[in-house]
Amino acid sequence: MAGAIIENMGTKKLCIVGGILLVFQIIAFLVGGLIAPGPTTAVSYMSVKCVDARKNHHKTKWFVPWGPNHCDKIRDIEEAIPREIEANDIVFSVHIPLPHMEMSPWFQFMLFILQLDIAFKLNNQIRENAEVSMDVSLAYRDDAFAEWTEMAHERVPRKLKCTFTSPKTPEHEGRYYECDVLPFMEIGSVAHKFYLLNIRLPVNEKKKINVGIGEIKDIRLVGIHQNGGFTKVWFAMKTFLTPSIFIIMVWYWRRITMMSRPPVLLEKVIFALGISMTFINIPVEWFSIGFDWTWMLLFGDIRQGIFYAMLLSFWIIFCGEHMMDQHERNHIAGYWKQVGPIAVGSFCLFIFDMCERGVQLTNPFYSIWTTDIGTELAMAFIIVAGICLCLYFLFLCFMVFQVFRNISGKQSSLPAMSKVRRLHYEGLIFRFKFLMLITLACAAMTVIFFIVSQVTEGHWKWGGVTVQVNSAFFTGIYGMWNLYVFALMFLYAPSHKNYGEDQSNGDLGVHSGEELQLTTTITHVDGPTEIYKLTRKEAQE
């Protein structure tokens, strides 16, 4: 009888395989912690207040904060009063990056948040539910002396959430409100060297536009982009892991097709998991260095969603295939209650992502969180996905409990077996429990490292060595799930090692009733694995 490799592998060989995988896991963490820089960099920008004194404020002119063709600018709003400069004449200009620097495609993306400095004035206070409306233009160029090319031009509304902690009295005029930061812009590629933002705050009292928003003194931006050094390390890992997973996947499927039976459901799911992992690994990001592919962030989200949906489905089916009877097993329809929440939750998160990053492909200033309807819609999708996730884990915990109970019940029949056969089945049970514990350890490690990366400063220093915790989290967890999928396809590939007839009927010395109980699910020579046969009878009872 041929089972999976894990069922025919000795403890010594299994430990050797585990040790090799552990070494690669440590290397994955060290690559991020010691070689790669931090994943992202945050840069603060202070806008420059330029003056547009032309009639009708023609939009084709770009206001540059510094350089040979810099704009006519004022230091503060108070300077505008004696010069009779109106609010509609002021353009807040931001040049990206800072002077004497260039942006690079290795930065992969740009994310900006906005902070308004609003002073308290008795005659110009922030009204309840106030909304600031910005007229924003984004341009780019690849040469310091070239003309600016418009990239986007949108009206950008944002709701203000500000509090004033001091008493609203004349002596506290001029103090700043404490305002929440606002989402401003996200671009999925950095294909150009220089970017320019021109932000206007047009005032129209008749239409109540930018009325009751306080006295805006300054506009600050914080730009976040991926570090080029981290990008190179990340691409290198993807380039290395892609052929590794692809080769083991081809080898795995070849061994399955060599069997005289069709693939069972669990084997198909493991193969699909390998495909989804390969889909994530394929380093298509290399093309983003030479092409302006703004959809890469959305594409990355979709790839991750497919992988996690397959991973969650595998855990359910892996448990179910060890507890269901022959009629229910090997059919995906038998898992509709457990897989259904995965499908619904994944679909909700996909719709949410399309509503956010999908729209940002044409409007980089869009955010679903800026309107009440958008916020409610986003929360609805997230809540439904959260409920589905909770239902999934309830199903999973119940199935894991059932499997362990079935195995524990079957262990009571082990003392009646011969020593050789008893040791054989004890080894099978140990390996099943071992894989379950490894799965829990991988999930726990993912959560732990995520929490650590959020609460630490991003790096640790031990003597003269600096460890980038956040980078180690990304490379380590990414490597861990690759190793997990690799181990699954290797250990659960069909083994070509057979138990001889003398072992089955002689050396193992099993009573006829026991033999019937343990082999009742065998339908042909290359039937289900040994652990399936061991647990099915208990599930039926």
UniProtKB/Swiss-Prot annotation:
TM stretches of this protein: 16-36, 233-253, 269-289, 304-324, 332-352, 381-401, 432-452, 472-492
The UniProt record lists the keyword Heme: no
One GO molecular-function entry: Wnt-protein binding
Domain of life per record: Eukaryota
Keyword annotations from UniProtKB, A to Z: Cell membrane, Cytoplasmic vesicle, Developmental protein, Endoplasmic reticulum, Endosome, Golgi apparatus, Membrane, Transmembrane, Transmembrane helix, Wnt signaling pathway
Compartments where found: Golgi apparatus membrane; Cytoplasmic vesicle membrane; Cell membrane; Endoplasmic reticulum membrane
Pfam families xrefs: WLS-like_TM (PF06664), WLS_GOLD (PF21883)
Membrane-side (Cytoplasmic) residue stretches: 1-15, 254-268, 325-331, 402-431, 493-541
Topology in membrane: Multi-pass membrane protein
Biological process (GO), any one: Wnt signaling pathway
Family indicated by similarity: Belongs to the wntless family.
Function per UniProt: Regulates Wnt proteins sorting and secretion in a feedback regulatory mechanism. This reciprocal interaction plays a key role in the regulation of expression, subcellular location, binding and organelle-specific association of Wnt proteins. Also plays an important role in establishment of the anterior-posterior body axis formation during development.
PANTHER family the record matches: INTEGRAL MEMBRANE PROTEIN GPR177, PROTEIN WNTLESS HOMOLOG
Protein name: Protein wntless homolog
Gene assigned in the entry: WLS
